[in-house]
Structures are given as structure tokens and as C-alpha cells.
Design a protein with these regions (language model features):
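C-terminal catalytic core of tyrosine-transesterase DNA break-rejoin enzymes
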Residues: 60
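Contiguous, often N-terminal, cationic amphipathic patches that form binding interfaces
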Residues: 1-54, 63-65, 69-74, 79-97
Length: 97
């Protein structure tokens, strides 16, 4: 697996992400400095981008949004997100631009 996805001690996936808010659409834009680069249409105001990120990841990984957790980076472009162990990280790259 890529450097941006690793297993946590509890068996969950930990994703290291770089987020660009205010993009034209929600899309995985490849890798950037060891992180998965995701562009989001939502603005980085009033927690809109974080909410959009979790919704986008849930759809891409086919898991419930409530099973994702923002671990670090609440106000940063660099984020750590935990996903359940049965999530398939490679699904995030299937539609990368």
C-alpha cells in the first residue's frame, strides 16, 4: 500500500491526506508529498470542507460516514482520517485524475 495509507494499532486504516478546498468538484488528485491529494468543492469555512471530506471518503470507500474519524488537522490542509479495517484504500485511487 502507498505511504498515505497504513494500518493503525486498532486495525483501522489511517489515511494521510492533503486537502485543497474550493475546487470545482470533489476528486482524488493523486499523491502529493506522501499524502493522498483530494480536491473538494466545499470552502474551508464553518467546517464545510471537513464535512465534505468525510462524506466524499464514505462514498468512495462504501462505508458509513459515521465510521470515519478526523484524527488530526481540523483547521489544516494536512489531515489524518481513520477508516474501518474493512475499507479498501485502493478504491480511492480508482477514479484519481
Amino acid at each position: 500500500m502507498s505511504a498515505w495509507a497504513r494500518r493503525g494499532d486498532d486495525g483501522r486504516w489511517i489515511f494521510s491526506l492533503y486537502i485543497t478546498p474550493g475546487a470545482g468538484q470533489n476528486v482524488v488528485a493523486g499523491e502529493r508529498d506522501g499524502r493522498l491529494h483530494i480536491k473538494l468543492a466545499a470552502r474551508a469555512a464553518d467546517n464545510q470542507a471537513n464535512a465534505a471530506l468525510l462524506k466524499f471518503l464514505a462514498a468512495q470507500l462504501a462505508v458509513a460516514k459515521t465510521r470515519l474519524e478526523l484524527l488530526k488537522g481540523d483547521t489544516s490542509r494536512q489531515k489524518l482520517v481513520a477508516a474501518p479495517g474493512e475499507a479498501a484504500p485502493e478504491r480511492l485511487l480508482e477514479n484519481a485524475s
